Amino acid sequence: QVRYRQCYFNPISCF
């Protein structure tokens, strides 16, 4: 699971 990666491509997903 690489959530930090999705946050990079999808900042909105980070929230």
UniProtKB/Swiss-Prot annotation:
Expressed in the CNS and midgut but not in the ring gland, thoracic perisymapthetic organs (tPSO) or abdominal perisymapthetic organs (aPSO) (at protein level). The modification Pyrrolidone carboxylic acid is found at Q1. Belongs to the allatostatin family. Strongly inhibits juvenile hormone biosynthesis. May act as a neurotransmitter or neuromodulator. The lineage of its organism: Eukaryota, Metazoa, Ecdysozoa, Arthropoda, Hexapoda. GO terms for cellular component: extracellular region. It is found in: Secreted. It comes from Delia radicum (Cabbage root fly). One of its GO terms (biological process) is neuropeptide signaling pathway. It comes from the Eukaryota. This is Allatostatin-C1. Keywords: Disulfide bond, Neuropeptide, Pyrrolidone carboxylic acid, Secreted. Disulfide bonds join C7-C14.
